[in-house]
Amino acid sequence: MMLLYYALSFILLPVYFIIILIRLLIGKEDIRRIQERFAIGKHRQDDSLDFMQTSANKEEFKGDTSLRTTTYTLIREDEGLGSTYKLPLEASDARRLIWINAASIGESMVALTLIHNISKRYPDVRFLVTSWTNSSAKILTAKLPKIAVHQFLPIDNIIFTRKFLRNWQPDLGIFIESELWPCTINEGAKQCKLLLVNARISDKSFKAWLQRKSFFQLILKNCSKIIVQSERDLQKFNELGVSDAVNLGNIKFANEKLPVNQEELSKLSLHLDNKRVVLFASTHPEDEEVILPIIKNLKEQFLDCYIILIPRHPERVKSIIDNCKSHNLSATAKSQNDLPVLSDDLYIVDRFGEMGLFFSVATISFIGGSFKQGGHNILEAAYFSNCIIFGPDMSKNTDIAKGVLQNEAAIQIKNGEDLLTKLTYLLRSNNALELTTYRENALKFIKDNQKVLDEYLNVITKFL
């Protein structure tokens, strides 16, 4: 089965090139880094990567005079369709490299949490983080510490995957959530032990994998450890024939609170002048179809209410503003005006990395992607003690959604009419106590579940 997949990946190589070209044309690829999709670029011995310090032309390792430069000869290992290369043991011991693969934004936040906490226990470990999307790349590039570097994940083809692994020679691989690239995982397991952490399978993917159960098992047998995020996910893995997975809970509970620039927060809070902010976070077009029609009604009822919208993909800002005009709404983007125009109907935040700032001033936050995309991360808003609302589709975050609802830490709505009804109810002054209770319960829910991090670290560090 795997050989068939490899053969298809060769045959479909021209299609991969076309897909990358299309993604480039529609702005989903970074032309400055397009070569990384083909494993061309940086590598473990790159002179420009001071964080590894294993290159033969370095005079010494910074901060540690006991580790002097030595010239190493790569060891060639012939396997199957090609060769892999490894550093001799004494070289790889100098700086162990953990490779973390994070598909998109949510997984990238988990990667940052792992890096921060693993490096506390093992300060000499260095990190390579791969991801697929432009949005995750921007966040990781901005937030990664000096002990880590980001690269785009190459196309899942044996040529590019083996080249990537030769370039980086990781000592441990950690895949987050549901990134199951067959070639990458199969070849990666030849280089180092692989862990699948915070693993989950959406209901849609589960149905698809049931038709390909043997292939699913073939991929997952390459993982030395599989840690799932819920009992439901554990059941799914078991039904797919993976019997050695364990459930430690959702590591997103351990993600650090989103950063906030305090100077910007003071300026924004002063500017908003005690207005009650309703934030629509990580929205998609399907969310905006529901949200935009109710804004006028909301603003007319509550003069002290201000609407802020943060699209999941900021590059959509022009189309959102056009949609606002079609609904007779006035809107300004942050790229146009650094502070909200209070006379407008809404303010659109089209910059990455500022979600924490706007959660800080929000009273109520609607979590986007919850009408058709399976929902985004509820917990980020909970850290800021927001009253949380989400739509009917939380299929990608089923257990967290169930947990917050059971603890009266969030509200689920069915449609646009229901959303308007709930917002109207919460914003009425005589319901202020109930609004405060939801906000307090959201923060308590986070704090009650944070012990999960230590359990994950205890498992992961056994492989270091």
UniProtKB/Swiss-Prot annotation:
InterPro entries with a match to the protein in the record: Glycos_transf_N, Glycos_transf_N_sf, Kdotransferase, RPE1
Membrane topology: Single-pass membrane protein
Protein residues bound to CMP: 311-312, 352-354, 377-380
Main subcellular localisation: membrane
SUPFAM superfamilies xref list: UDP-Glycosyltransferase/glycogen phosphorylase
EC top class named in words: transferase
Reaction(s) this enzyme catalyzes, per UniProt: lipid IVA (E. coli) + CMP-3-deoxy-beta-D-manno-octulosonate = alpha-Kdo-(2->6)-lipid IVA (E. coli) + CMP + H(+)
Pathway field: Bacterial outer membrane biogenesis; LPS core biosynthesis
GO cellular component: plasma membrane
Presence of the UniProt keyword Cell membrane in the record: yes
GO process terms (BP): lipid A biosynthetic process; lipopolysaccharide core region biosynthetic process
EC number: 2.4.99.12
Catalytic site positions: 107 (proton acceptor)
Keywords: Cell inner membrane, Cell membrane, Lipopolysaccharide biosynthesis, Membrane, Signal-anchor, Transferase, Transmembrane, Transmembrane helix
Localization per record: Cell inner membrane
Site (Transition state stabilizer): 177, 252
Family of the protein in this entry: Belongs to the glycosyltransferase group 1 family. Glycosyltransferase 30 subfamily.
Known function: Involved in lipopolysaccharide (LPS) biosynthesis. Catalyzes the transfer of 3-deoxy-D-manno-octulosonate (Kdo) residue(s) from CMP-Kdo to lipid IV(A), the tetraacyldisaccharide-1,4'-bisphosphate precursor of lipid A.
Protein name (Swiss-Prot/TrEMBL): 3-deoxy-D-manno-octulosonic acid transferase
Organism (species): Rickettsia conorii (strain ATCC VR-613 / Malish 7)
